């Protein structure tokens, strides 16, 4: 008997839509804040990882590609990727990159730096992305945040796709920074 489908089983489409919209207009990168705030909100007020289990479009996309379309080798995830040290180390690295992005946005807002119309993949490789933004549409700091945030989201998607192909479809979920943060919140909340 087939499992009944729910509306949230199709959120993988939102992940594709997000990256497609950002390819044509960088300002759509702000929509990614939903994936940053909603898991934290649900963990704080719900005390669970409902977002990760049901609402994460990226995890669903990896399942769809890896399992349904057989793009994954389905090899076991290396133990070190599931270790506490790797989880928190990757989270710290990720938060450092996020903090740097926010700082760059601040510098643009303060007039101390100019807008960089480029995506940085893997926090290193500059990819010109200027066609996605028309100067003057919004203030420069709003655009700078968009470029930085889209860089972060696209880099994490690429990391997730790489580990999906090499290992199990949802290997990214084993060390996803949002999953690590929500897990920590749930542990703290359930101690009470």
Annotated model-derived regions:
Residues 1-192:
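Non-ligating segments of multi-cofactor redox enzymes
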